[in-house]
Swiss-Prot record:
Membership in a protein family: Belongs to the major facilitator superfamily.
Induction field: Repressed by YfmP.
Subcellular location, principal: membrane
Gene that this polypeptide is encoded by: yfmO
Membrane-spanning intervals of the chain: 20-40, 56-76, 80-100, 114-134, 142-162, 171-191, 214-234, 249-269, 278-298, 301-321, 339-359, 364-384
A Pfam family recorded for this sequence: MFS_1
Name of the protein this chain belongs to: Multidrug efflux protein YfmO
GO molecular function, one term: transmembrane transporter activity
Amino acid sequence: MDKTTQVNQKTGLLSQPKAVWAVAFACVISFMGIGLVDPILPAIAAQLHASPSEVSLLFTSYLLVTGFMMFFSGAISSRIGAKWTLILGLIFIIVFAGLGGSSSSIAQLVGYRGGWGLGNALFISTALAVIVGVSVGGSAQAIILYEAALGLGISVGPLAGGELGSISWRAPFFGVSVLMFIALIAISFMLPKLPKPAKRVGVFDAMKALKYKGLLTMAVSAFLYNFGFFILLAYSPFVLDLDEHGLGYVFFGWGLLLAITSVFTAPLVHKALGTVRSLVVLFIAFAAILVIMGIWTDHQTLIITCIVVAGAVLGMVNTIMTTAVMGSAPVERSIASSAYSSVRFIGGALAPWIAGMLSEHFTASTPYTVGGIVVFVGMLVLLMGRKHLAGIKAGH
C-alpha cells in the first residue's frame, strides 16, 4: 500500500464531495422512515381502533414492497439513470408520507406505507451505488458512510417520531414529507448527472444473482437475521408500556449505539475475526438477547437495557454483512446489493405481523423467543455456507 492510498483511507470518510453528503442526508431521512412509527404505534392502535397485529402491518406493507421492488430497482436505474431514480424515489416518499398523515383508517395508512416503501426501494438501493460511485476513499469507506447514515436515520427516526407524535400521530408523517422535499432539492442541485451504465441491467438480473451460493448464503442469513431485527423494533413498543416520548428516547439510544458500532467497531471486529466468525459470534449474541427478553418480558428496565445493547450488536452485523455481500458473487455490486437487500427486507416484512399474531394467540414473550430461535437458525445457515464465503476479505 502506497502513501497516497493510506492518506485517502484516513481522510476519505469525511472528505467527501457535496454530492455524497446530499445523498447521505437523504439516506438519513429515508431510514428515519423505518423507526419513525415506532413510538406512535400504540397511539395509532388506540386512535384508529386497530389491534397490534393490524398496526404491525405498517411495517409489513412498507418492507414487503421495499423488498420486492429492490429486485427491479437496478434495472430501472440503468434505464433512467441513477440521479433520476433517486429523484423518483424521493417523490414517491414525499407523496405517500404526506398521504399517510392524512389517513382516516388503518387500511388507508397501511396502503400508503406500501407506496412509501416503493419510493424507499428506488432510493435506498440506488443511493448505496451512488455513494460508492462518487465518494473518495474506496468502497469500504463508502459502505461505512452509508451504514452510518442508516444508523443515524434509524436512531433519529424514533426520537423525531416521539417528539412529533406527542403532538399528533400524524405529525411524523408530515415531517418526513417536508424533510424529503428538502433532500429532493439538495440532490437535484448538488448531485451531477451520472452516466448510465454501458450495459443495461436485466429485469431479472438481481434474482438470477441468487444462484451464486455465496450471495444466497448471505441473503438467507440476512432474511432470518432481519426477522429478529424487526421483532425487536416493531413489537417492543407494545411491551414497554411507555408514552411517545419514552419510546422515542429508548429507540434513540438503540439507534445511536447502532450508528456508532457500524462506523467504528464493525471494521475492527471484521478485520480481527473475518466475515463468518464475526457474524457467527454476533448472531449468537443477538439471539441470546432476544431469548433473554423472552424470559423476562415483564421486567421493563431489563427490556430497555436489552434493546439498547442490541443496537451495538446490530450495527456491527449490518456493516459486516453489507461489506461482505459486495464480494460474495461475480456480479456488479449494485446487482448483488439489490438481490441481498430484497431478501433481507422481505424477512423484515414478515416479522412484525407474525409477532403481533404470536402475542395475541400465545403470550407476550413468545415473539422474542421465536425471534431468538430464527436468528440462531440464521447463524447455522452461515456456518453451513461458510465454504462459499471463504474468498470474502474483511473490508472488501
